């Protein structure tokens, strides 16, 4: 069933509100319209393009929150963090991240994104990876966007260890998962 313009724009607004990192291409597929139609709808509704939406979300003073490493050392663009709870980053897979012969992302970039996010979520000036159990579930290609989500699973104050679960997605598909045992000072 094809939606009329007013209905489509209402759903577009709701979709972007609930999923701010959705691309125009994904929206076009979802609503069965052209990318240009999605862009025109966004303009009419004064909804910024994806990059601007990402920047807007990231302006939640991440610089003041992350203690364990400088933000420019986080692989990917960190867009949300709640220390000792959860964090999110986005990595746009570009030419420099892939093998030239097949445009498949090199695994160490996906690991680095997840590992740096596991470090960044720790509410401590000292956070080091003690152990990692990781799994790559599918190849990632050039041009894809990897959204990595870290969640603190447990914290052992006596041992100074925190377990952080990280899952990385392309769209809704898990492409990488890992459990990171993080060493931290025993003060927290």
Curated annotation (Swiss-Prot):
One of its GO terms (molecular function) is DNA binding. The keyword Repressor applies. The keyword Plastid does not apply. Gene3D superfamilies: Hotdog Thioesterase, Winged helix-like DNA-binding domain superfamily/Winged helix DNA-binding domain. Keywords: DNA-binding, Fatty acid biosynthesis, Fatty acid metabolism, Lipid biosynthesis, Lipid metabolism, Repressor, Transcription, Transcription regulation. GO terms for biological process: fatty acid biosynthetic process; negative regulation of DNA-templated transcription; negative regulation of fatty acid biosynthetic process. This is Transcription factor FapR. It comes from Bacillus pumilus (strain SAFR-032). The gene is fapR.
